[in-house]
């Protein structure tokens, strides 16, 4: 099973809490995290794109770097780990994204991939006068399908004459093409999002579900497998998971309860209000899941809490769910979290023994 890190390009990472570590994003911080992840054999690092935050007392995600330029910098200082940047497709034309991806591919020696998002939070785009209207919620995956068709043509052939509803290319050229295979990731969990991933993506992100219920995301994998059976393509699921691991289980649980006690209710309320705007995509979207009040303090991503042994065992359980290709991990304190995972959790995981062997061989 692959393991990646969802690096904190936005302030405070993925905890909407006054009691969680408070920090602003910087290149130096993300460089240190990514280099540490590479040291411990993590397979990839991915950064999101967020153009407007949720506010609240913690000013959650009000401070953000830009994904592609951050990953370009990280490409220059890493050597093995795969890097994924996120394209906000509403404001980044596919020909420009293809050229930026080719540039980062050159910097990294073929280690770059793209996470494609449609955009769900209207204020991110309306603040710039670039929101296309709320009808977009209903046809955003049709838009993304055309976008990706253009992108793939440019990345593989260096030229596109694509003609569609949203995009019309006129002998659009983009050379050189990348040296590496630029993998595509999508995080859609609605029916249309799943269909898109099955047709175009190499990986599909899904949310882990619940606290210490490692296999609870299995129904999402089942839907993806059904969609790929129709498309005839293999697409692996990558599961978003927060890890709170300590030597003693009670210490990890004490952290979790402390973070929940300091939940930033104003920021959580903003998330809920924004998720309610989309009335066209159905009830199974990622943003609906994120805004569920059950565990909104970390946007309801699957959470594994316990001793190093307990967390390792739960991650191995996740690897056994059919269709799982990997996990993408977040932490409360990323530098400390990656260190503890690499030193104490990963060595106990059956699903990561191949990585330990590779690390030993490289010493």
UniProtKB/Swiss-Prot annotation:
InterPro entries according to UniProt: Luciferase-like_dom (IPR011251), Luciferase-like_sf (IPR036661), Pyrimidine_monooxygenase_RutA (IPR019914), SsuD_RutA_monooxygenase (IPR050172)
Keyword Oxidoreductase: yes
Keywords assigned: Flavoprotein, FMN, Monooxygenase, NADP, Oxidoreductase
Any single GO BP term: nitrogen utilization
Entry binding sites for FMN: 49-50, 115, 124, 140-141, 190
Molecular function per GO: alkanesulfonate monooxygenase activity; monooxygenase activity; uracil oxygenase activity
Cysteine disulfide links: none
Lineage top rank: taxon: Bacteria
Enzyme class: oxidoreductase
EC number: 1.14.99.46
Catalysed reaction equations from the record: uracil + FMNH2 + NADH + O2 = (Z)-3-ureidoacrylate + FMN + NAD(+) + H2O + H(+); thymine + FMNH2 + NADH + O2 = (Z)-2-methylureidoacrylate + FMN + NAD(+) + H2O + H(+)
Protein's job: The FMN-N(5)-oxide reacts spontaneously with NADH to produce FMN. Requires the flavin reductase RutF to regenerate FMN in vivo.
Family: Belongs to the NtaA/SnaA/DszA monooxygenase family. RutA subfamily.
Protein name: Pyrimidine monooxygenase RutA
Source species of the chain: Agrobacterium fabrum (strain C58 / ATCC 33970) (Agrobacterium tumefaciens (strain C58))
Gene: rutA
